[in-house]
Amino acid sequence: MKKGIHPKYEEITATCSCGSVIQVRSTAGHALNLDVCGQCHPFYTGKQRDVATGGRVDRFKKRFNVPGVSK
């Protein structure tokens, strides 16, 4: 590789919201904060987690509930 044209590829720390710390190599140059990792992701753990507790449509239906109107 040519010198001086590539970004520095250095070791950084990626910290997950569950508390696990992972050492990775990256060109980002700063520590990363992760929402999920392999130790807490529902696919890998087999546990379900309710991320969305209702959206805007549910809030609208609750707010403007008209009796007798159905789909």
Curated annotation (Swiss-Prot):
GO terms for molecular function: metal ion binding; rRNA binding; structural constituent of ribosome. Zn(2+) binds at residues 16, 18, 37, 40. InterPro entries: Ribosomal_bL28/bL31-like_sf (IPR034704), Ribosomal_bL31 (IPR002150), Ribosomal_bL31_A (IPR027491), Ribosomal_bL31_sf (IPR042105). SUPFAM superfamilies: L28p-like. Binds 1 zinc ion per subunit. Its cofactor is Zn(2+). Disulfide bonds: none annotated. One of its GO terms (cellular component) is ribonucleoprotein complex. Pfam families: Ribosomal_L31. Keywords: Metal-binding, Ribonucleoprotein, Ribosomal protein, RNA-binding, rRNA-binding, Zinc. It comes from the Bacteria. One of its GO terms (biological process) is translation. Binds the 23S rRNA. Belongs to the bacterial ribosomal protein bL31 family. Type A subfamily. Part of the 50S ribosomal subunit. This is Large ribosomal subunit protein bL31. It comes from Photorhabdus laumondii subsp. laumondii (strain DSM 15139 / CIP 105565 / TT01) (Photorhabdus luminescens subsp. laumondii).
